[in-house]
Amino acid sequence: MVLGWLFERGAGGWLWSVLLCLLLGTACHHPPDASGGRNLLLGKKPSAASGVSGVSRLTDGVAALTGDDWETELNAMFRDEEASVTYDLGAVVPIHGIWFETDHNDDYRFMISEDGVVFEQLWDSPATRAGGMQDRWTDKLDVTGRYLRIQPTQGDGRYAVAEVAAFSELPKVFPIEPARQRGTALQTVVRTRVLLFAFAAVAFLFATCEGAPLWWLYLCGLLPLVAGISAFESINRAWPVEQRGVSLVRAASAAIAAAAVLRELYAPPRFPALRAAVFGCLGASALIAVLAFYNLGRPQFWDGQTQQPTPVHLLDLRQYYQTAKYFDEIGYRGMYLADVAAYVEDIPGATLESLRDTPMRDLATHRLSSIGEQRDKIEAVKKRFTPERWQAYKTDARYFREMMGQRDYLRYMLDYGGNATPVWISIAHFLFSAFQANTTAFLLTGLLDPLLFALTFAAIGWCFGYRTMCVVMVVFGANDFIMYGSNWSGATLRHDWLMYIALGACALRRGRAALGGFFLALSSTIRAFPALTLVSASIPAAWWLTEYWRSHERRPTWAQIQELQRPLLRLLVAALATSLVLVALTTLRWSWPAWGDWFWKVEKLNADPHANSVALRGLVAGWEQGHYQLLMARWPLYASLIVFYVLGVVLALRDRPLEQAAIAGLILVPVVFYAANYYIHVVCLLPLLALERRGSADAPRLSLADGWIWLTLLLLCIAQYWTVLVTDMPLHFHLATVLLFAALTAIVVALVRGNVREGRLDFLVHYLQTKRAA
C-alpha cells in the first residue's frame, strides 16, 4: 500500500510542510469590506444571540444574489419572533444608515441601546413584494448608541438574513453593493457534508494500519472528526432535516460500517487493519444509524392541538390503545363504529345524517364503506358498554380526536385497525387499562421499546460479539423499509416481537435452549410469522435424522435422539409449553372466538393486495389492478421461487448451530407471507447468521462467507437511499422488494457455498457429479 511505502521512507516531513502552508494561507485570508464604506459590523461577532443559527454569516461581507432562496448556507436563520442578535459597537457612536438583506415576506425590527440593557426602537423594516432574498435599507437615521439589535417581528415563520451593515457615515454609494454569491440550499449542504463525513471515515479506515506512526494516526483521525463536526453543524443549521437527508445519514452509516468490515476482512497481511479504527467506526456508525431510526431526534408526528411536532405515534396508538383497552366491547371489528358514535355525542351539531357520506372501513369485512351504510351498527355499538366504560371510551377518543384534528381523525378510519394476536392484546390491555389516554403516559410507555432495544443490543454484544452487535444496530437503523409514518418509534411495544427473536437467539448462543424456546414462542404468539424460527431451528436435526437413516438404514432410538438432540428438544418443549400456556390464558380471558377473529383478520390481510407489501408475491405479480390474475398466470415462476428459497435455506442449515438455524427462518418471512413493509425490519437480525469468532487478535474474526452476509446487508441499506427518491409509494415499495430479494438471494447463495467449501454438502456434490458423469 502507498501509505506503507511512505511510512517506511519517512516521508512525513513534506506532508507537514504542505499542511503548514495551508494553515498559514487560511490564517492570512480575511473577507474584504464589501460595503465600500465604514461598515461598523463587518467581521464582528455578536455580543449576544438567541435562537439564531449561522450567526457568523451576518457580518462576513458576503450577501446572497437578489431573489435567491431563503434557506441556503449564506444566511443566518432566526428560529422565531423571539430570536435576536445583538452587536456591541465598542463605544457610543452615531448611526445614520442601515442596510441588510433578508427574505422578502418577513418584518424586522432594529433596536438601539447605550447600556445593552434598555433598548429603544430604531427602525422597522416591513416585508416587500419581490420574491426571495431582497435588499432593504434606510438612510434616514440620526441616533447614537453602542448596542445594535435585530430581530424578526412577524412573517411566515421562516426567517433568514444574509448580511447586515450599519454606518456612522454613509458611503458615497448607498445602498451599498456587497460581494454576492449564489447560495446552496441548506438541505443540499447537509447531504454534501454527510457524504464528506462518510468519505473521511472510510479514508481513515484505509489510511491507517497496525504499526503506523502515532503522528500519522492522529492526523488521519482528524479527518472524520472535523468532517463529523462540519456535518453536525450543517444539520443543526438546516434543522429540521428533510426525509431525504435522514435517509442519506442512514446510507452513510451503512457505508462506514461496510468499509470497516471490508477493511478488516480483506486487509493485506502486511498492513492489517487498525483495530481501534475498525471498532471506533463500527461503534460510531451503529449509534448514528439508531439515531437515524429516530429521525435524528426530530418528532415525526403532528399534534393538532398545539400545532407542533410530537414524538407520540398517534396514528398507531389510536388503533392499538383503544382496541386493547376496550377489547371486551369492540374486539377487532368495532373500533370505528364506537369512534363515530362517540364523535356524534361529543361534537355539537354532528349527526349520523350529516356524516352519512364520510368514508370508513368496515372492519368486519375490510371493504370500504361509509357512515351511512354502517348507521345501524353505529347506533347499536354503545349497548356493548356499561355507562362508565362508555364515558371512559369517549374521553379517550376525545384525546385522539383533539390531538389528530377532526379531519385526520375521520380520514384515518380507512386503516385496517389493530391486528395483533390476543396475546399482545392481553399484555397491552393490562398496560393501557392503567391510565386514561394522555401524552405524558404515552411518552413513558413509548420508552419501553428503546429499553428493549438497549437490552437486546447489549445481549447481542455479550453473546455474539462487539462487531456483530454494531452491524445489527446499523442494519436496524439504516434500512429504509419502515419509511416515515410506518416507523414505530413513539408507539408502545411495537418492536417487542422483533427483540424477543433476538433474545431467543442470544439464549441459544449461550446454550440456554429452554430460554431460547420461551422467547421464540413469545414472539410467535405475538406476531405469528416468527414461528418460522422454530421450524428452521429443526432443520439441522432433520439433516441428522436423514444422515442417520442413510448410514444405519433404520431410525435412531428415542434414547439416541434425547442424547444427541437434547438442545433442540428443550427448545421445542419450552416453545410448545409457552405457546400452550399463553393461548390458554388469553382464551380464558377473551374466549376462543377472539382467536377466530384474529385468524380471519390476518387471513384477510394476507389475501388482499397492498401497495406497501414487501414480499415475493408482490415481486412476481406487482401491486396494480389484476394482481390475482397475474399471480395465477405466473404461478409456475412463483412456486419455483418459493422452492428455491426454501431449498436454499434447508441446504444452508446442514450442521449449523441452533441460533443460526433459528435466524435463517427469517429469510422465509417475505417468501411465505405477504408481509407489510414494516415487518421486513427482521432483516436487522440477519447479521446473526454470521458467527464472529473469538480468539487471538491475529485470527480472522469472520469467514469470507460470513463477511459477505454482512456486506450484502449493509449494501442493501446503502442502495435503499435511491428508493427514497421515488415519490410514487407503490413503486417505491416494489423497488424495495427487488432490492430485498437480491440481498436474500446473495445471502442464501453465500450460506450454501460456505457449506460446500466446508464439506457439509459433500454427499450432494458427489451425487451431482455422479449424475453429470452418467
Residue ranges and their predicted role:
Residues 133-141:
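Exposed aromatic-hydrophobic patches
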